[in-house]
Regions:
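Active-site nucleotide/adenylate-binding loops and adjacent lid/helix of ATP-dependent enzymes
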Residues: 2-11, 74-77, 84-185, 229-232, ...
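Short catalytic/ligand-binding loop motif for oxyanion handling, primarily in non-cytosolic enzymes
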Residues: 16-18, 62-64, 141-144, 183-184, ...
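Short, solvent-exposed loop/turn segments at secondary-structure boundaries
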Residues: 20, 148, 286-289
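Anionic group-transfer/hydrolysis microenvironments
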Residues: 59, 137, 178-179, 191, ...
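Extracellular structured ligand-interaction cores
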Residues: 131, 187, 258-260
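Phosphate-binding site of ATP-dependent enzymes
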Residues: 152-245, 264, 272
Length: 305
């Protein structure tokens, strides 16, 4: 154990103070006997051998150069979450793997660049009715996500342009129906630290009809509190399945420092998993009393170990 272990919180150039609500994290860690600092992950002047325990936070630009980001994680002696987990979770194909395990995810059509799909072939993969969402498999936050409706010709054309543009850039594309319950009931995010649920956040969607997402627009937090029993039950089951899967995939047991599970009601008394965030998750630490301290406790416990 180290008396004052160094902790480096990692961000990107555009977010020098981490996520909103995390501004006090340095003080909280210092109060717990840590020696904290904030660094930008791709800053060439940083000596990462002196970084101590690295905690990945607001690296919202990783998707613009995922290979460089993953290469950076490999040089770190100690990083949370681990480099293997970051590798797995930075590509949303992980949802296909979780669905294969029986986890209730939103049904998805996957379009791959190597398929060389024609315009007609892409069009046949559009849903026949209702609203749908187009997003790249490698993305951060709500970047490059479009919401469209099938009944409007111009929107279908816009969706086609987005899909062709992403595929043309060599990016895998996800196409999902838009879950109407998001507008009716909102999304629920369950936040876990060291495997224990900390708090729950109910959000309104940042996606508006007939639009591509604006990275500057974030979900609106409606409520933040302890998870209710139903949401907690589902979140705990998802956490258990995810933990078991990652353990089998990596070949060793691993508990995540932080984990955010995004759920949406399916309209049938259950939930669908929208996303599992283990990389650059906004943990909504300023949304509810105690959340910032909970995260600082979790980091400090590992740093002092």
């Amino acid at each position: 154990m180290t008396a004052h272990p160094k902790v480096t919180l990692v961000t990107c150039k555009s977010m020098p103070n981490l996520f909103k609500g995390e501004e006090g994290l340095l003080d909280e860690l210092a109060a717990r006997g840590c020696d904290p600092q904030i660094k930008v992950w791709n800053d060439p002047d940083v000596d990462w051998s002196e970084a101590g325990m690295v905690v990945v936070r607001s690296v919202s630009d990783y998707a613009s150069d995922r290979p460089a980001f993953l290469e950076w994680t490999k040089q770190l002696r100690r990083v949370q979450n681990s480099a293997d987990v970051l590798n797995w979770n930075t590509d949303k194909h992980y949802l296909k793997e979780l669905a294969a395990l029986g986890m209730p995810t939103i049904p998805t059509n996957w379009l791959e660049p190597e398929q060389n799909l024609s315009k007609h072939q892409i069009h046949t993969r559009f849903p026949a009715f209702g609203e749908f969402v187009v997003k790249p498999a490698v993305s951060s936050g709500v970047r490059d996500i479009g919401r469209y409706t099938t009944v409007d010709t111009r929107q279908r054309q816009a969706a086609m342009r987005q899909v062709q543009g992403l595929l043309g850039e060599g990016r895998s594309v996800m196409m999902q129906r838009y879950v109407e319950e998001i507008d009716l009931h909102g999304e629920i995010s369950l936040v876990f630290f060291n495997g224990l649920v900390s708090h729950a956040v109910e959000k309104r969607s940042a996606l508006h009809p007939a639009s591509v997402s604006d990275p500057a627009v974030h979900e609106a937090v409606v409520t933040a509190e302890a998870a209710d029993s139903v949401a907690w039950k589902w979140g705990e089951e998802i956490r258990r399945v995810l933990h078991g899967y990652v353990r089998s995939r990596l070949g060793h047991d691993e508990q995540f420092l932080f984990n955010r599970v995004d759920l949406v009601p399916d309209g049938k008394g259950s939930f669908l998993v929208m996303e599992v965030s283990l990389v650059d998750a906004d943990l909504y630490l300023g949304a509810t009393p105690g959340a910032l301290g909970n995260f600082a406790d979790a980091i400090s416990a590992r740093a002092h170990w």
